[in-house]
Each structure stands twice: as C-alpha cells, then as structure tokens.
Amino acid sequence: MDLGRPNKEYIRYVFKTPEYEKFVSSLNPKVRQKFDYVVDVITTIYNVPTKFIKHLENTDLYEMRVSIGTNEYRTVIFAIDNHNFIEAGNVILLNGFFEEGQQRLS
C-alpha cells in the first residue's frame, strides 16, 4: 500500500493498494496518464464531479471513473474517515477493472 503523503495543498490523501497499482501498471501509457489525472482531480478538488466519482448505491463504496474514447475504466474507492466522499480526507483505491460498454442497436 502506498503510504506516501502529498504536500499540504491537497484536499485528500489517496492510498493505493497493491492490487490497484498492479492493475494500473498493466495499462498502456495513455490510459495510465488519464488515471493519474483523475487521481489528481480527486486529491485537489473538493466537489469532485460525478464524471470522475460516483457513489455505488446501497454501499459505502464509490467508483472512480476513467474514460478514454469509448473505453470505460472503473476503480473501487473507499472513503476511510467519512461516509461521504466529499467530506473524506483519506481515501483508498482498492482495485480497478475495464467496464465493457453496451452495444448500440441500429
């Protein structure tokens, strides 16, 4: 687990499990760059748009959302010190996966 502390300008500390790190390292560089961008948004923006973070209904979990073209990637997130992601100062990225899109019928 990555326990590195960001500097004080950050709103949230983001911890990364080995499973998350392994998933992200398996992705191509362009996708990894987008993951880094979304993590930066999470750490520096108080009200993170639902484009990047969405609460999973009936759970204490959230998902981080990364979109590259038509490809959708998700990472399960847990807010460590608050039930509400926005109020959380510490979050952990648990694991990621590729979400297959729905095919459009013509």
Task: For the regions a language model picked out, list residue spans one by one.
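Basic, Lys/Arg-enriched alpha-helical interface segments
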Residues: 1-72, 83-90, 98-106
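A short loop-to-beta-strand scaffold at the N-terminal edge of the catalytic core in hydrolase folds
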Residues: 74-77
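Conserved catalytic cores of phosphodiester-cleaving nucleases, focusing on short active-site segments
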Residues: 94
